[in-house]
Swiss-Prot record:
UniProt KW keywords: Chloroplast, Membrane, Phosphoprotein, Photosynthesis, Photosystem II, Plastid, Thylakoid, Transmembrane, Transmembrane helix
Stored InterPro entries: PSII_PsbH (IPR001056), PSII_PsbH_sf (IPR036863)
Keyword Protease: no
Organism, scientific name: Welwitschia mirabilis
Lineage: Eukaryota, Viridiplantae, Streptophyta, Embryophyta, Tracheophyta
Entry protein name: Photosystem II reaction center protein H
Length: 74
């Protein structure tokens, strides 16, 4: 036989902790998906804002955008 059965008495049960009991309700929704798009449009909006922010940083770094009164010397 290729498989070996492990004795059931050797398995230990997970230890219950106070923080685990406190966080269990947060994990009770695991695997459940709300119908519809949910907050996907909001996430897309913030992704666009983040992309704009990163492009502004890149343009400032490349001196494509000149900031008056701020000397940039790398």
């Amino acid at each position: 036989m290729a498989t070996q059965t492990v004795n059931e008495t050797s398995r230990t049960r997970p230890r219950r902790t106070g923080i685990g009991s406190y966080l269990k309700p947060l994990n009770s929704e695991y695997g459940k998906v709300a119908p519809g798009w949910g907050t996907t449009p909001l996430m897309g909006f913030f992704m666009v804002l983040f992309a704009i922010f990163l492009s502004l940083l890149l343009e400032i770094y490349n001196s494509s955008i000149l900031l008056n009164g701020i000397s940039v010397s790398w």
